[in-house]
């Protein structure tokens, strides 16, 4: 199995450190069942809605039954948002894609 990259090449060293601090905080919050209040504290309602939409975009892109334009119309998301999701999915490590497929598509009908 390929080792996953811990840092984001699109972020500065400082921003990567801040991101990893947040990820560690979230992991601790999950372990203590505090993840929902933490995310509500850290994210605005619009940001939480946007994350939910991004999950749906990734799910539908992986399902592969709708064009990006159809997906835009169904979800009410901008075409640029869907294109970014598509490009991110293409660049994702294979083990993440497999995990997402199991989490998002297994035992779900369209």
UniProtKB/Swiss-Prot annotation:
Tell me the protein family, please. Belongs to the TrpR family.
In the record, biological process GO terms are: negative regulation of DNA-templated transcription
GO cellular component assignments: cytoplasm
Superkingdom of origin organism:
Bacteria
Q: What is this protein called?
A: Trp operon repressor
Q: What does this protein do?
A: This protein is an aporepressor. When complexed with L-tryptophan it binds the operator region of the trp operon (5'-ACTAGT-'3') and prevents the initiation of transcription. The complex also regulates trp repressor biosynthesis by binding to its regulatory region.
Keyword Nucleotidyltransferase: yes or no? no
Q: How does it assemble?
A: Homodimer.
Q: Which PANTHER family match?
A: TRP OPERON REPRESSOR
| Gene expressing this chain | trpR
> Which keywords, in A-to-Z order, does the entry hold?
Cytoplasm, DNA-binding, Repressor, Transcription, Transcription regulation
InterPro entries under this entry?
A: Trp_repress (IPR000831), Trp_repress_bac (IPR013335), Trp_repressor/repl_initiator (IPR010921), TrpR-like_sf (IPR038116)
Q: Where in the cell is it found?
A: Cytoplasm
In which residue ranges does the UniProt entry place its DNA-binding region annotation?
Answer: 68-91
Give a Pfam family name. Answer: Trp_repressor
Q: Which GO terms describe its molecular function?
A: DNA-binding transcription factor activity; sequence-specific DNA binding
């Amino acid at each position: 199995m390929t080792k996953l990259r811990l840092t984001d090449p699109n972020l500065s060293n400082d921003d990567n450190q801040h991101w990893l601090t947040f990820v560690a905080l979230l992991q601790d919050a999950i372990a203590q069942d505090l993840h929902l209040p933490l995310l509500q504290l850290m994210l605005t309602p619009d940001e939480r809605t946007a994350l939910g939409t991004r999950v749906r975009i990734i799910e539908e892109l992986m399902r592969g039954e709708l064009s990006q334009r159809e997906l835009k119309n169904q979800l009410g998301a901008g075409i640029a948002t869907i294109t970014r999701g598509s490009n991110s999915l293409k660049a994702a490590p294979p083990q993440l894609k497999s995990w997402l497929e199991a989490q998002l598509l297994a035992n779900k009908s369209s």
